[in-house]
């Protein structure tokens, strides 16, 4: 059995990404990995992180003309199992990247972190959408070291963020931020959106090589 040409990493009898031993990591990544450990406390929820004004600005960019749809997960045969719709290229008018980065550095007491992108993207999750168990930095992209999600609405059913190895299920409120390590200790899934539409601001941060 292989995952994207690698041996898979198995959690709860599911392939959740490449096996960690198959991926070469930089010393800076290893330093961060060892520093934070595998505590449940590394899953951080910050209530009311964004203001109504900031959320309204982001949601004003939910425009079908700028929507890009993509396959977010495939089965072992390469068939699409989940689609996400993104609204891309949003100008960071309110310095949201910096706000999130400052919070991450504070939460993990670690400074060598940078955002992967320079513009913001909103993900739309329609009813019926879900994301099966996976690990962010063991997937097709292996540099998604720290994911951050800001919830832009809460008027939907389902769509919980679940960390089964930590016995944790989260359905945040509008404006809340969630950050967590993207490594092997934090496999997670998004439960099916039962009704309504779920909107999130999804941002990834990386641990760059130290010069």
Question: Where are the regions that the model predicts?
Answer:
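Non-heme Fe(II)/2-oxoglutarate
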Residues: 2-113
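Catalytic core of non-heme Fe(II) oxygenases with the double-stranded beta-helix
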Residues: 94-211
């Amino acid at each position: 059995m292989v995952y994207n040409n690698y041996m898979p990493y198995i959690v709860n009898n599911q392939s959740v990404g490449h096996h960690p031993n198959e991926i070469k990591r930089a010393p800076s990544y290893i330093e961060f990995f060892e520093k934070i450990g595998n505590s449940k406390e590394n899953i951080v929820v910050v209530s009311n992180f964004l203001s109504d004004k900031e959320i309204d600005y982001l949601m004003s960019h939910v425009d079908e003309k700028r929507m890009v749809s993509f396959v977010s997960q495939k089965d072992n045969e390469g068939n699409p199992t989940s689609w996400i719709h993104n609204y891309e290229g949003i100008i960071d008018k309110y310095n949201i990247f910096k706000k999130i980065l400052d919070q991450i550095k504070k939460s993990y007491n670690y400074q060598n972190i940078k955002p992967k992108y320079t513009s913001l993207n909103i993900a739309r999750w329609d009813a019926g959408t879900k994301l099966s168990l996976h690990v962010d930095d063991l997937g097709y992209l292996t540099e998604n070291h720290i994911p951050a999600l800001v919830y832009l609405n809460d008027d939907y059913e389902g769509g919980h963020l679940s960390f089964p190895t930590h016995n944790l299920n989260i359905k945040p409120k509008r404006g809340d931020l969630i950050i967590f390590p993207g490594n092997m200790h934090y496999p997670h899934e998004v439960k099916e959106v039962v009704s309504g539409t779920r909107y999130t601001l999804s941002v990834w941060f990386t641990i760059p090589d130290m010069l």
